[in-house]
């Protein structure tokens, strides 16, 4: 199950990066 949690963390970080990118694109 630890591997599963690692996947969740990885996906979460990726999602955060995408959201931040979209927000930055929207502001400019």
Curated annotation (Swiss-Prot):
The modification Glutamic acid 1-amide is found at residue 25. Residues 27-28 form a propeptide. The keyword RNA-binding does not apply. One of its GO terms (cellular component) is extracellular region. It is found in: Secreted. GO terms for biological process: defense response. The keyword Secreted applies. It comes from the Eukaryota. Expressed by the skin glands. Keywords: Amidation, Amphibian defense peptide, Antimicrobial, Cleavage on pair of basic residues, Secreted. Belongs to the frog skin active peptide (FSAP) family. Cruzioseptin subfamily. Has antimicrobial activity. This is Cruzioseptin-4. It comes from Cruziohyla calcarifer.
